[in-house]
Amino acid sequence: MNAEQILQTDTLKTLYFTSQDTVLMTDGTLQTCDFDSPAIESIKQLVKANPEQFGFDFEPDLLVRFTSRSHITQWLNDISKEVPAAPSASLLQQSETATRAKRVLEQAVLKGSSDIHIELFKHQTRLEVRVDGRMIELMKPIGEYEYGELLIGYLFNELCEDKDDDFHVGTINNGRMSLLLDTPKGKRETQWRLAYIPAKDKGGQCTLRWSNKETSIPTLDNIGWEAGHVNVMRDFMNSASGICLIAGQTSSGKTTTIAAALSEMKRQGRSINTVEDPVEFDLGVIQTSVTAKQGQDNHFNAYTKALLRHDVDIESHGEVRDELGAMDVCRKGETGQIMFSTLHTSSAVGIAHTLNEQMHVPSALLAAPDLMKLWIYQTLVRTVCPHCALSLEQAKETWSEQQKTHFAVWQASMASFNPKSLRFRNPEGCSQCVEGEKGRTTLIEMVVLDDDDRALILSRDYLAWLKALKVKGFKSVVDHANLKILRGEVDIFSAAGRVDGLFPKDTNAVYQGLWEEV
């Protein structure tokens, strides 16, 4: 047998490349290297529903025959090398691509993914998803360029309601789409933000962010903060005016935090408006979704300026990205409103440097009395699965020598702790988790700005400012990580992957060891 005897449609090829263990031959037999493969039943159902499409009548049951995995692999490689169809897909091909797209999205959704990455290479398509912050394969790599090209093209050209342009493999593109899908919480309308960037060899990457994944808004008491953090935020929420900025990486929970705060503040006698790109939570207040168009750098500013005429008490801007956006936030804070916004930087103290040095907000404005009130940095770290977590003694058996050294350094930096309270991820995992972890919790640090802070911000002496904060008892994100490690909530090495400085470093020892022979 050879690849020419394999029946091929887009739907069948999706099943072949997804399972990589079963194919349907022109004589109506199924060749498989795994009799338990789910692909066998999927192909049977497909043929039963469409017997005329495959050139033979459906028998009571298709004959399943065993073949080696090497044969299957070779046949799939041969299929992927065949000349692709013309770019203008037939109606049948488009229909099959639509089925493929929905299947990919539903697989990702049912895994609890926040993002889908479709990576297009010269002779291969890769599909990966982000679950609890970790990138994992959605399916095995598909040895075909056309698979990914058609999939991305269909998403942009047929499903996107708002996009920069029609899809072209060599052009940056952005868009949004909505699709009814089966989710872990039942069938519902899912909303996606798409971004595409080209790469070498006519490749590229399409990233899909599930923007309305969460169906409910958590309370401030349930986002992983300590009670003291919540009290500080509520003090700010009850103030007359001022700015709260929340920093962090992409997917660090910043928008969720603001949603929790605004949800608590609504219907309390104050007018609330948000300007977002895009709207992610339904807050029950006036929310404006801003659409970026090519060549329009000030689109966000036009909306925020319009809100000056709308008698707003509390306002939230999705993200500060540039000088214009930063000055908008400062302007609103000066007009007597409570302002929330987010930005990308790596610490709460770093907000000052980012706004001043990168976005050119004058230090005098940042240090203005009662303007900047609360700066927060947060990140998300995976939590240890309670069903298969390891004790310290069990975990040590799985660690590398480097991990043992790091743990010893961390242990020496702790004043005292109960080793029995520590818990570590089980690399083998269980049916309830992925590699020993399930879900995520928040690690944060807060700066509650006072006049001493403002004086040091004005002088731009950020190292002195950090020292002064520590004297006052400032709790850093490292401190919060250590607290949750000691409680057994998070694995120390998972936390170290999200928080710098968890393992203290002696730079003298580092430099002296650079040329030591291993």
Feature map (PLM): residue ranges:
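Short Lys/Arg-enriched alpha/beta "domain-start" segment
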Residues: 1-14
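N-terminal "pre-motor" subdomain/linker immediately upstream of P-loop NTPase catalytic cores
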Residues: 10, 17-57, 78-245, 249-252, ...
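Conserved nucleotide-binding/hydrolysis micro-motifs of P-loop NTPases
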Residues: 37, 122-124, 135, 183-184, ...
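Residue-level signature of catalytic and energy-coupling elements of molecular machines
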Residues: 116, 192, 236, 277, ...
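NTP-binding/hydrolysis catalytic cores, primarily Walker-type P-loop NTPases
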Residues: 221, 230-232, 402-518
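Switch/coupling sub-region of P-loop NTPases
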Residues: 242-244, 259-384
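Cys/His-rich Zn2+-binding cysteine-cluster or related metal-binding knuckle/ribbon modules and their
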Residues: 252, 347-448
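Walker A/P-loop
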Residues: 255
